[in-house]
């Protein structure tokens, strides 16, 4: 169990909002840290629903734990969800990593300095970070193979390619997504001052021309579309994020991801 006094900073992604609040995040020790997230909050701003196809099992996008395990030359990131991770679309057949529907973005703020990082989320997430919590690195955990992910980054996020990390190893084990990253890509081994935020999304093999392999959220759910959002494409395309453990974490998440202009094409 983590104690509040030992928590590290947690970045709070605000959906197309001008500011986000800084919170402590994860506990420090010689082996890294583990942060738990409440269950049952895989609803984005509180209204989102899963696609209707049976492959999107309840809990598939519900983060329960985030863990960072540093090593001498590489770091392992682990994102655990509420249900066992499966591979219904046979990812090895298309060069994938052994799972199909989940995708996670791990944002890292290494300095907490204004204007030193990126405030915008990756294309298709529709989120924005506050100026003093802009991310300096982001690790993409995708079922798509590295060649496909790097190609998408080059086409849709080339301006940030030096900050985007495609892991050397991506795999799933039980309920956990695992990414192994060279510390050199992070700018060095993880530090106790770093801040983190994880966005849980869904892998879309046929994304919108501007979206980086992300699945859209519409007003009504469909076979392969989340529902409960907006068809104007200005809502956050995020099912779950990390929130601080004090108070009502789910309520805080819903507030954060509700900060967008509804029923309009304007952000």
Describe the role of every protein-language-model region.
Residues 2-12:
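Bacterial N-terminal signal peptides that target proteins for export
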Residues 13-22:
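Bacterial N-terminal signal peptides
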Residues 22-28:
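Bacterial Sec-dependent signal peptides at the C-terminal "C-region" and cleavage site
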Residues 28-36, 110-124, 187-267:
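Acidic/polar low-complexity flexible segments
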Residues 29, 50-142:
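Surface-exposed, glycine/proline- and aromatic-rich loop segments on solvent-exposed faces
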Residues 63-65, 72-76, 101-105, 164-178, ...:
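Extracellular structured ligand-interaction cores
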Residues 81-83, 110, 173, 183-185, ...:
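Short, flexible loop/turn elements at secondary-structure junctions
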Residues 137-194:
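Short helix-loop boundary/capping segments
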């Amino acid at each position: 169990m983590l104690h509040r006094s030992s928590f590290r900073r947690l970045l709070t992604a605000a959906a197309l909002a001008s500011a986000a609040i800084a919170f402590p995040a994860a506990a420090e020790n010689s082996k890294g840290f583990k942060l738990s997230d409440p269950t049952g909050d895989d609803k984005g701003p509180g209204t989102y629903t899963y696609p209707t196809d049976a492959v999107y099992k309840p809990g598939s996008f519900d983060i329960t734990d985030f863990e960072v395990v540093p090593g001498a030359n590489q770091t392992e990131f682990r994102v655990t969800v509420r249900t066992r991770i499966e591979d219904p679309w046979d990812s090895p057949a298309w060069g994938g990593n052994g799972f199909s529907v989940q995708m996670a973005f791990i944002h890292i703020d290494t300095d907490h300095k204004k204007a030193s990082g990126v405030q915008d989320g990756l294309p298709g997430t529709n989120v924005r970070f506050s100026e003093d919590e802009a991310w300096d690195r982001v690790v993409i955990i995708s079922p798509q193979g590295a060649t496909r992910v790097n190609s998408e980054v080059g086409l849709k996020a080339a301006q940030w390619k030096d900050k985007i990390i495609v892991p050397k190893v991506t795999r799933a084990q039980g309920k956990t997504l695992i990414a192994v990253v060279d510390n050199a890509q992070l700018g060095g081994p993880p530090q106790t001052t770093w801040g983190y935020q994880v966005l849980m999304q869904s892998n879309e093999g046929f994304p919108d021309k501007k979206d980086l392999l992300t699945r859209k959220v519409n007003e009504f759910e469909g076979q392969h579309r989340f529902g409960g959002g907006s068809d104007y494409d200005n809502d956050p395309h995020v099912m779950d994020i990390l929130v601080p453990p004090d108070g009502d974490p789910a309520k805080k998440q819903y507030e954060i991801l509700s900060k967008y202009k509804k029923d309009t094409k304007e952000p």
